[in-house]
A protein has these predicted regions:
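Active-site region of the double-stranded beta-helix
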Residues: 1-125, 139-147, 151-204
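Histidine-centered metal-chelating micro-motifs
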Residues: 127-129, 134-138
């Protein structure tokens, strides 16, 4: 599978590289986060949200909406699932990492998706990117030995536990957390998830 760069023109339909943001303190804070052999996701870390840098992301990237700053760390080389939100997600690569991305527009009416349409993008350490709301994405893949660390910025409450009942029909069956619609691959064995990814469970 060809691994493209986030600076390539082909990335423009999925997101953009963010310029003019200071991320040094956020990167420093990430040094204290765990790096497990599997994948861990923490939606909100108060220490990072209290940094002055957080205010810039809240005001400039989200137009003043309340945000949460968390992380996704680990060691991963498989697609396993794809998710989307009703809002852009900002990722800051603490280490080099690879993102497997798709377009929501390619999801079929029955909410299945052909994994042959997925594209891979290399994100170098220190890079901040915006991943558009219509971009299918999931956990990063490891690009360097030892795993990856990735900052995840989203509107407050995203990816947190549901506090309301959800339907079983249409797009409702994809909701697995607040502001999170997930399509899983059967091989991933994600409990309770709709398995609509068809084709290879891509491995890098």
């Amino acid at each position: 599978m060809e691994i493209q760069k986030v600076t390539d023109a082909s990335f423009k339909k999925y997101g953009r590289v963010l310029e003019g943001y200071t991320v040094d303190r956020i990167l420093k804070e990430m040094e204290h986060t765990p790096l497990p052999k599997d994948v861990i996701y923490v939606p909100s870390v108060e220490e990072m949200e209290a940094l002055p840098e957080a205010e810039a992301f809240q005001n400039r990237a989200y137009g003043g909406l309340p945000i949460q700053i968390g992380y996704c760390n680990g060691d991963n080389n498989k697609l396993n699932a794809l998710e989307y939100h009703r809002s852009s997600e900002i990722n800051i690569a603490v280490t080099d990492m690879i993102l497997l991305l798709g377009a929501q527009q390619d999801v079929k009416d029955d909410f299945t998706y052909d994994t042959s349409l997925v594209e891979a993008f290399y994100v170098p350490a220190g890079t901040a990117i915006e991943v558009y709301a219509t971009t299918l994405h999931y956990a990063p893949c490891t690009a360097v030995e030892g795993g990856f660390r990735c900052v995840v910025i989203l509107p407050a409450g995203t990816n947190t536990e549901l506090t309301f009942p959800i339907g079983e029909n249409g797009e409702d069956k994809l909701i697995t957390a607040k502001n999170k619609w997930l399509i899983a691959h059967e091989e991933a064995g994600i409990e309770g998830a709709f398995c609509g990814l068809q084709g290879e469970n891509i491995t890098l």
